[in-house]
Amino acid sequence: MRDAIAEPVPPPALADTPAAAMEELRPAPPPQPEPDPECCPAARQECMLGESARKSMESDPEDFSDETNTETLYGTSPPSTPRQMKRLSAKHQRNSAGRPASRSNLKEKMNTPSQSPHKDLGKGVETVEEYSYKQEKKIRATLRTTERDHKKNAQCSFMLDSVAGSLPKKSIPDVDLNKPYLSLGCSNAKLPVSMPMPIARTARQTSRTDCPADRLKFFETLRLLLKLTSVSKKKDREQRGQENTAAFWFNRSNELIWLELQAWHAGRTINDQDLFLYTARQAIPDIINEILTFKVNYGSIAFSSNGAGFNGPLVEGQCRTPQETNRVGCSSYHEHLQRQRVSFEQVKRIMELLEYMEALYPSLQALQKDYERYAAKDFEDRVQALCLWLNITKDLNQKLRIMGTVLGIKNLSDIGWPVFEIPSPRPSKGYEPEDEVEDTEVELRELESGTEESDEEPTPSPRVPELRLSTDAILDSRSQGCVSRKLERLESEEDSIGWGTADCGPEASRHCLTSIYRPFVDKALKQMGLRKLILRLHKLMNGSLQRARVALVKDDRPVEFSDFPGPMWGSDYVQLSGTPPSSEQKCSAVSWEELRAMDLPSFEPAFLVLCRVLLNVIHECLKLRLEQRPAGEPSLLSIKQLVRECKEVLKGGLLMKQYYQFMLQEVLGGLEKTDCNMDAFEEDLQKMLMVYFDYMRSWIQMLQQLPQASHSLKNLLEEEWNFTKEITHYIRGGEAQAGKLFCDIAGMLLKSTGSFLESGLQESCAELWTSADDNGAADELRRSVIEISRALKELFHEARERASKALGFAKMLRKDLEIAAEFVLSASARELLDALKAKQYVKVQIPGLENLHVFVPDSLAEEKKIILQLLNAATGKDCSKDPDDVFMDAFLLLTKHGDRARDSEDGWGTWEARAVKIVPQVETVDTLRSMQVDNLLLVVMESAHLVLQRKAFQQSIEGLMTVRHEQTSSQPIIAKGLQQLKNDALELCNRISDAIDRVDHMFTLEFDAEVEESESATLQQYYREAMIQGYNFGFEYHKEVVRLMSGEFRQKIGDKYISFAQKWMNYVLTKCESGRGTRPRWATQGFDFLQAIEPAFISALPEDDFLSLQALMNECIGHVIGKPHSPVTAIHRNSPRPVKVPRCHSDPPNPHLIIPTPEGFSTRSVPSDARTHGNSVAAAAAVAAAATTAAGRPGPGGGDSVPAKPVNTAPDTRGSSVPENDRLASIAAELQFRSLSRHSSPTEERDEPAYPRSDSSGSTRRSWELRTLISQTKDSASKQGPIEAIQKSVRLFEERRYREMRRKNIIGQVCDTPKSYDNVMHVGLRKVTFKWQRGNKIGEGQYGKVYTCISVDTGELMAMKEIRFQPNDHKTIKETADELKIFEGIKHPNLVRYFGVELHREEMYIFMEYCDEGTLEEVSRLGLQEHVIRLYTKQITVAINVLHEHGIVHRDIKGANIFLTSSGLIKLGDFGCSVKLKNNAQTMPGEVNSTLGTAAYMAPEVITRAKGEGHGRAADIWSLGCVVIEMVTGKRPWHEYEHNFQIMYKVGMGHKPPIPERLSPEGKAFLSHCLESDPKIRWTASQLLDHAFVKVCTDEE
C-alpha cells in the first residue's frame, strides 16, 4: 500500500505547505491489527497502543519496508501508480493475514477537491512547471530516505521532535477517539468487550474430612497435573478479547491520524474534512460504472476498416493492390497516430478518475468494504488492461524517440515511425517509476558517449561532442555521394510498420532508406566496434521489447513443436532467453479481451518498428563493409584484419537476424511471415559470406608462397572452419558453399606442396649441373654435393610439414562432412516401404516438403529433438556441440522425388503406418527444399557412427538396395568437393614418388660422370641421407593418406602403397650395404611401413604379384639385417648414417624436428612450445651437433656415428631462440604470420651490450644511470658511521617536533619563494599535487628543455618540460596555457598524457607521460619493414582523427613529435603549434591563417597561405604522408635540400615528395590520397581509417 493520500489539492498548494516534511507523518492504516512505524509518531502510539501492539511493531521490521516486489502484478512494467500500489498491498493483506502491510510513496497529488470527479482532471496538472515538480519530488524523496533510516535505528521520537520543531507552528486540534465520523468505517462498529465469565462448577463438593491424608494428597497432585496439561478456555477467551480490543483501537487511531493529516493538508478542520470526504464518496458508483463501460470515443476521426487495432491488426506483409495502396497509404499512418493520441488522452483521464476515487479512502480494503464492485473480477481485469496498455504505449513511444536521438534523426514522422506527442510531462500520473526514467537517460548518455571512448580509456572526455547528427549533416553527407554507392538499394522501412508494406505510400517511402543510419553507423564502427554497438543497443531496447512481445503474444494460437533455440554462438554478445519470465506471462490472458472490448489501438506498429530499426542498423553495417571492400587484391599484411572485420559483421548480422525472428515469430504467427521481408538482408549476408570466402582463399594462397608456410597453418584453418560451421547454417545456401570452399582449400594445399617439391628439386638440379659445368676441382664438386644434399633434406622436411598440415585438415573435413551413406534401390519403392513398415519405421512429415520422404527407427519416434538434430545434420549444421546426449543408434533415411503424381505411381506417396509431424527451423526447411537427393541417403550425426549404422541397416534390408558410396556428404556439391580432395591427395603420392626418382637419377648421373673412386664413398654417404629423408617423408604421407580414403579410393591408395614399398625395397637392395646382424636405425621407418600394409591391400593383388612381393620382402629383410660378422672392406661404411635433418635458421630449437620419430606424423601435433620447454638442453646439444656436422666433413664412423662433442665457441645467434635484437622486430612478430622467419631483422647478428639497450637519443641509458646513482646513494647511506647516525636521528627528531608545533600553530614557517599558484589558477591549469625529483636532460627543443622526472610518492617515471620566461611575461604564459588546455581536453592511448603543471616566477614545469623508446624519427633512420609501417600509420591516423574530431589542428606532425613506448604504442605529442578551432563541425580548408611547423612536412596551402584563405585540418594529413615516407626511406622528405626556403619553394610550386618504389601498391595508394595538392580533394583522417593500408590487427584475437 502507498502512504495515506492527502485530499487532492492542486500542485501549487503543495509548494505552499511543508508537504515534504509532513510526508513522513502520513499514516496509512491497514485494516490488520499491527501498527506501521512509518505512519504515526511514536509518542502517539505509546499513548494509544497497548504492550502487545508495541511488541508486534518491533517483531518484524522487514514487513514495514517501503519497497515491495511489484514485478508480479502486471508483468509489463513495475506497478508504479499509487492505485497499483494499493491493489498490490490489498492483495498482500488478503494473502498473508496478520502481517503488516507496507506502503509505497505517493508521487503526485490529485486535482482540487472542489472539482467534480467527472471533469477532465488533467487540465489543472498541465499548468504546473516540470522543473518545480522535479525539484519538489527530489527534495521529498531525499527527506524520506534520510528519515526512514533514522526511524529504523530506533531514533523515532528524536526525529519526530526535530521535524516538528522545523515545521511552522500550526495548531492541531485534539482528536476524540470515541467521536463518530462519517468518513471512517470503524466509527459505527461495536466495540468488542471482554468481561470475565463465571464458569459453572460441575464438580461435586466433597468433604475433605472423609478422606485420609494420603488419598487427599494424591487427589491434589492429580488435579494440578491435569491443570498443567490443559489449556484454560477462560484464559483463551480473555486473550482473544484483548487482541481484538488492541487491533480495534490501533485501526481506529490510524484512521483518525489519516483524517487529521488530510484536514491539515487541505487547510480545513477535521469536521469539515470529514463532511467533504463523505460528500465526495457519493460519486464513486458513477466512476466505477464509467470505468466498467469505458470505450474509446474517436469522435470525428474517420478511419478505414483496416486500422491497426486489437480487434483486427493488419499483419505485416499483407498484400494490397496498387490502387488500394495509393488510396489508403499515408492516411492510414496518420489515422493510426490520431487514434493513439486520442486513446492515450482518454485512458489517462480515466486513470486519473481512478486515482481520485482511491484517494478518498485511507486503504483499498476500506474502499472494497464500502463498494463490492471495486473488488470484482471484471473491474480488476479492466483496470489491469488499462494499466498494461498505458505503460507499454508510453514506453515504446519514449524508446522510439530515444532511438531517433541516438541515430541522429529529428523528424521521425517523416520516415513513418508511429510517434505521437504526449501532451503533458506527467501524462499517466507517475505510472513509470523515476528510477526507470533515470536509468533510460543514463543508458542514452552511455550510448551517445560510447562512440567517443576507446577500449583502453573507458572514461569519456568532457569535451566529447554528443553523437547527435542533424538532418542537415545527413543531407550533406548524402549529397557528397557517400550514400549513393552501387550496392545501395531503396529499401523502405514501412514493412516494419503494423499497417503493412504498402501503406506508407510513395511520399513516405522516399524517406525510409536504411542509408539514413549511415553517419551513425560509420562513426560507431570506427570508435567502438560492432560488438559494443550491438551490446548497447540491446541494453537500451531489450527490456521494452520483451515486455511488449509478451503482451502481444496471442494465447489462442495453435502451438506446434518447433526448434528455435537462442543463438549459442552469440553468447559473448547478448544472452537470448527462449522463455520469458514467469511473472510476465500472466498479463496477456486478461488483457486481450479487455483491450478488444475498449477498442484500444494496438501498440504492435511501434513494436515492429523498433525491432526493424535494430535490424536495419546492422544491415547498414553490412552494406558499409561491402562498400569498403578494396578494389584490388588485398595484400598479406592487411588481409588478416579484413577477414576479422568480415567475421565480426557476419556474426553480428546473424545475431540480430535471430533476435528479430525471436521477437516476431509468436507476434506475427510464424517465421514464414517474419522471413518474408528479410530478402534484402539475406542477400547482403550472402554477399558478405562470399567476400569472406574470397578473402580466405586469397589468404591461404599468399601463405603458401612463404618459405616457411607450414608453421601454424593447420591451426588457422581449424579456427576458420569452426567459425564457418557455426554461421553457415543460418545463411541461405551457406553450408554447401562453405564445404566446397574448404575442400578446395585443402586440395590447394596438397597441390602447392607438390609444386613446392618440384620447384625445389628444379633449383637443386640446376645448381648441380651448373657446378658440374664449371669443371672445377674435386673440392668444389664435393662442396657442391654436400650443399645440395643438405638443401634436399631441408626441402623434404618442409614438404613433410606442409603435407602433414594439409592432410590433418583434410581428415577433419572428412570427419565433419562425410556423415551419410548412399544406396541405390535394386527393388521397387513399394517393396522397400513394406520392408520399412515391417521393421516398424516411422515416417517424418515436414509441412511444405511433401516430396521429401524421411524415415526414422521406431525408437526415435518420441525423441523429436533427436530427429530435429538429424535433420539439421543432414543440411550441414554442426551438431557435435549440442548439449543433448547423442544416440548411438540415431539415424534417418532420406529420399526425394519430383512431384506427387509420380510418387503415387511409384508408391512413395502411400504410407499407411505410423507418422510423426516435425516443424524444423526455417533455415533447415530452406536447405532441405533446395537439396538434390537422387538416391536413398542414410544420415547420422557423427561420422564415427556411420559404419556401424550402415552395416546394421544393410543386414536388415538385405537384397533391396546396394551401396553406392560407403561414406559421402548429404549434399552433392560437398560430395564432389570431397572426391576432388581425395584425388588431389592421391596425386601427391605420385609426385612424391617422382621426386625421389628424380633425386636418385640426378646423383647417379653425377657420380658416374665426375666423381673419382676415392671420393665416391664419401659423397655416396650424403646422397643416401637425402634419399632416406625423402623415403621417410613418403612413408609418413602414405600411412596418413590411407585414413583419408573410403570406398573405391581405398583400393587406389592400396596400389600406390604397395608400389612405394616395392620402390624402397629395390633401392635398399641396389644402393645400400648389407647389415651386420642387427636392424640399422635408418631402416626402422621402412620396416614400420611394411608392417602397416593392410590385409585388404594384399588380398586385392593377383597371385603372381603377391608371390613377387613376398619374395622381395624376404630378400630385403635379409639384406638389411645381414650376418653378424660380415667384413667391412671400404674405408668408410657405405650404409647411411642416422639421418639428422639440419635445422633451418628459422626452425624452433626442437629435437623432434632434427630426428624424425618412428611414430610419424602423430608427433607433429604436439605444440612446439611444449616440446621446447622440457627439452632445452637436448635441443641445444642437437643444434651444436647439427652445426658441427654441417661445418666439417663426415668422419669415419660407419652407420652408428659418434655424437659430436660440444665445442666451446661463441654463441650462435641462429641456434638460440629469438634474440633480443631490434624492438621493432619483436613488435612485428605479433602481427606477422607465424611461419615467417624469426630472424628476419637486419640486425640479428648484433651483440647486445651488457647495460640496458638504448635508443639513439640515450634517454633509456640516462634513466638507467639515474637509477644506478640512486641505488649507490642508498648504499653509501647505509655505510655511515655512528656519529653520522646520531646526527641524523637528532635531525629527524627536530623535524618531527617542528612539524608538530606547526600543526598546532605554535610556530610559523618562512617561505623561501612566494607562492605563484594564483597565476596558475587564473589560467585554469591543473597543478601537480605530488612530490618529484628531476633527472637527466633527454632533449631540447624550440620551446624549452625536457628532463626525466621521478614522482617521489609512486616512483613513476615522467617527462618534465621546462619553459623559461621573463617575470610577468604574460604572452609566453598564455601561449603555454593554450598548449596545456589542448592537453587537458583529450585522453587517448595514442596521445601523450598530461599530468599537470607547476608555475614559478621565471619558469614553468609541465609534467607529461614519459615514452621510453624515443621518437619515430630515431627508430626510422634505417627504414622500417612494411608491416611495422602499417601498424604505426594506423595508430598515428587514429590519433589525428581524435584531434580533428575535437576541433584541434596539430600543425607540426613529424617523426620527432611522435613517441614510442615499450608496449609498442605510438603516441602523438608536442602540442606547441596546435590550435583549437572555434567551430568543431567546420571541415573547410580555411580554418587557420598562421604559418607554423616544420618546412619539410608542410602542406602546400600552409606555405602559400592558400591565396589568403588559410589552411585547416587537411594540413595534418599531408604531414602524415610525409611521416610515412620517412618511415619507409629513413629520411625526411626533401632531404636533398639544405635550406627550408628551397623546400618551401618546391612545395609551393606544386611538387610532391616522391613516393618510395619499395612500398606496396596499397601503400602507394594511401600516400597518393595523403599528398593531394588540393586540400579539398585530400582524404580526411576518418576516410583514411577505412583504407586497406591501415587494416592491420593491433591485438591478437
From Swiss-Prot:
Domain Protein kinase spans what residues?
A: 1332-1590
Q: Which SUPFAM superfamilies match?
A: Protein kinase-like (PK-like)
Cross-referenced SMART domains: S_TKc (SM00220)
Aminoacyl-tRNA synthetase keyword on record: no
Q: Name one Pfam family in it.
A: MEKK4_N
Where composition is biased (Basic residues), the residues are 84-94
Localization of this protein: Cytoplasm, Perinuclear region
Provide the residue positions that the database annotates as binding ATP.
Answer: I1338, G1339, E1340, G1341, Q1342, Y1343, G1344, K1345, V1346, K1361
Q: Which residues carry this modification: Phosphothreonine?
A: T440, T451
Which GO annotations describe the biological process of this protein?
Answer: chorionic trophoblast cell differentiation; intracellular signal transduction; male germ-line sex determination; placenta development; positive regulation of JUN kinase activity; positive regulation of p38MAPK cascade; positive regulation of telomere maintenance; regulation of gene expression
Which organs or tissues contain this protein?
Widely expressed. High expression was found in skeletal muscle, kidney, testis followed by heart brain and lung. Low expression was found in spleen.
Subunit description: Monomer and homodimer. Homodimerization enhances kinase activity. Interacts with CDC42. Interacts with TRAF4; this promotes homodimerization. Binds both upstream activators and downstream substrates in multimolecular complexes. Interacts with AXIN1 and DIXDC1; interaction with DIXDC1 prevents interaction with AXIN1. Interacts with GADD45 and MAP2K6. Interacts with ZFP36; this interaction enhances the association with SH3KBP1/CIN85. Interacts with SH3KBP1; this interaction enhances the association with ZFP36.
The family annotation for this protein states: Belongs to the protein kinase superfamily. STE Ser/Thr protein kinase family. MAP kinase kinase kinase subfamily.
Q: What is this protein called?
A: Mitogen-activated protein kinase kinase kinase 4
